[in-house]
Swiss-Prot record:
It comes from Streptomyces avermitilis (strain ATCC 31267 / DSM 46492 / JCM 5070 / NBRC 14893 / NCIMB 12804 / NRRL 8165 / MA-4680). CDD domains: lipocalin_heme-bd-THAP4-like. Transmembrane segments: none annotated. It holds the Pfam family THAP4_heme-bd. Gene3D superfamilies: 2.40.128.20. A motif (GXWXGXG) lies at residues 20-26. HAMAP family: nitrobindin (MF_01297). Belongs to the nitrobindin family. This is Ferric nitrobindin-like protein.
Length: 191
């Protein structure tokens, strides 16, 4: 279910499907890097201004699904305009800052992004650009990332399937929103 908070900036309504905390797992595979399964936690939040705040933490998983070590951390800010053009600024822990542009699909909650600019610190590894696809599918958030370096052409390197995380605060908010005249047996929901 996509919930649109009453204090969400009006320009961000098309991105409301991203809001919340997400967790799941995926696959990482790129030449010169360790191929592995990874766990991921993502949050998209807002404070009433015209952008979403984004945070992602990934970690390598062992064969039993246990956390082994951090893989990648990134954070950033996402905006969308009236023409459904999306811009994102993201910073990664490996010393890369990216500006992404793309668009929100016309009839489905899907975002295609492409890097417009990449800045790297001296500590960053080779990286020259990428693409990302985010989609809201059957109440889950799925994404795939592609990247390129001077040595490797653009290719997929990470993808994940994330589920919405329900917090105690969510349950409390939903409970407060229930109608006062709800029947004791709850059957009315199914009639």
């Amino acid at each position: 279910m996509i919930e649109i908070p009453s204090d969400l900036h009006k320009d961000l309504v098309p991105l409301a499907f991203l809001l919340g905390n997400w967790a799941g797992a995926g696959v990482h595979d790129f030449p010169g890097s360790e191929k592995c399964n990874f766990g991921q936690e993502v949050s998209f939040t807002h404070d009433g201004r015209d952008f979403l705040e984004y945070h992602s933490h990934t970690w390598v998983l062992d064969a039993d699904g246990n956390k082994v070590r951090p893989l990648e951390t990134e954070s950033g800010f996402w905006r969308v305009d009236a023409a459904r053009k999306v811009e994102a600024v993201m910073t990664r822990d490996d010393g890369v800052v990216e500006i992404w542009y793309g668009e929100l699909a016309a009839k489905k909650p899907q975002i295609d992004l492409v890097t417009d600019a990449v800045a790297r610190t001296a500590a960053a590894g080779p990286y020259s650009g990428g693409k990302r696809l985010y989609g809201y599918v059957k109440s889950d958030l799925m994404w795939v990332g592609e990247k390129q370096t001077p040595e490797v052409e653009l290719r997929p390197y990470m993808s994940a399937h994330l589920k919405k995380v329900v917090t105690p605060e969510d349950v409390e908010r939903w409970a407060k929103a229930l109608p006062d005249d709800m029947p004791d047996d709850g059957i009315a929901f199914f009639k």
